[in-house]
Amino acid sequence: MHTHASRPHARQSALPRRAALFDFPASADLSPDTGAARQHTIQWLSRFRVFENHASVEEYDALRFDVLTGLFYPRATGADLNLGSDLVGWYFVFDDQFDGELGCRPEEVARLVADVIRVTEEDMAPGGTGGGEGPLLESFRDLWHRINSGRPRVWRDRFRHHWLEYLHSYHREALERTGAAPADGGGDAPRSVEDVLALRRHSIGVQPCLDLNEPFGGYTLPSALHGGFPLARMREATDDVVVFTNDIASLDKELAVGDVHNSVIVQWKLAGGGVEDAVRHIAGLANARYGWFEETAARLPELLAEAGADPGTHRAVGRYVDGMRHVMTGNLGWSLRTARYDERGTEAVSGGRERPWARLTGAEDLIRAGRGAPPPPGSGPDTRQPMPSEPSQLA
């Protein structure tokens, strides 16, 4: 691939220029308790020994996940925002575990995913918790119990389903990364942007974040409404907008580390031409999704009235739609403010460097102890070939 996208000067100017391609706003609507949530989550992760020293804390803090949370939930305050901030912080700490050797070890990834899933199956009663498994699982157990405590069963089942989809996506990514599983196109078919979306809609972790809008807003959507048209399709559009935004924002970082689970990179490989052509194409797909979302949101009151929805349902759906909108515009707003995607973020993971909190699972010790080094990225069969089709437009 071309190398000019990795040069420092290009990195400094590329993201704002690329973000200007989006037709939707970059939110600046922050919860007033964002600063307090920032301190809370750093203390919470520190309590579970996620950070090895002060330098690790400073590196984490520069990524400003508190801002992402405050933009996702601008009306949440206090304990609710702290809970959302802990969820977002844990997400990214977990995600960073797979940037090194572990991400190329599907069997080890499957074991880790199974360990996390077991926590979701534990007794929620006091005293029904384990311990001693290390920072990642212990912090997740605390988070899981706090999120689910006192919630309605229908909500807890939905939330867990979305979590399982999220967790299993890491194993699938590891299989694809090592060539152990073909891309969804199969055979010799080229890999497409739609193939990337099929996996990234889960690995992006948007659905559990959307789920929190319900307890934070004091309502629970009925399953038929949540899973029916048009909300299910609006949630998918939200997934796609966040994926496309993230893939454009993180492009230089992922080019630097050789990650292939990026719609821009796949489109570039499929269509040829310059990388900025691929960026414009993906931005266009994001704009189409967002445009469809807003058109559908404008029709929702009429659709709900035709269905005989009561005023409480109208209010709940309106809040949920606002929550989806906050996630899309907030993700873009944060992407322009975080150090994760600027030149500092790219340099922080270049040359094989990992984040200081990237080895919390113990899997790397097992690998070094006798299971051999993982195959280098790209050494297996090429799984990055796209299919000759584009994702269908939401219309």
Curated annotation (Swiss-Prot):
Keywords: Lyase, Magnesium, Metal-binding. Mg(2+) 1 binds at residue 95. It is an enzyme of class 4 (lyase). Mg(2+) 2 binds at residue 95. Residues 346-395 are annotated as: Disordered. Gene3D superfamilies: Farnesyl Diphosphate Synthase. GO terms for molecular function: metal ion binding; terpene synthase activity. Mg(2+) 3 binds at residues 246, 250, 254. InterPro entries: Isoafr/prist_syn (IPR048128), Isoprenoid_synthase_dom_sf (IPR008949), Terpene_cyclase-like_2 (IPR034686). It catalyses: (2E,6E)-farnesyl diphosphate + H2O = (+)-isoafricanol + diphosphate. Its cofactor is Mg(2+). Residues 346-357 have a biased composition (Basic and acidic residues). Binds 3 Mg(2+) ions per subunit. It comes from the Bacteria. Its EC number is 4.2.3.157. Catalyzes the cyclization of farnesyl diphosphate (FPP) to isoafricanol. Belongs to the terpene synthase family. This is Isoafricanol synthase. It comes from Streptomyces malaysiensis. The lineage of its organism: Bacteria, Bacillati, Actinomycetota, Actinomycetes, Kitasatosporales.
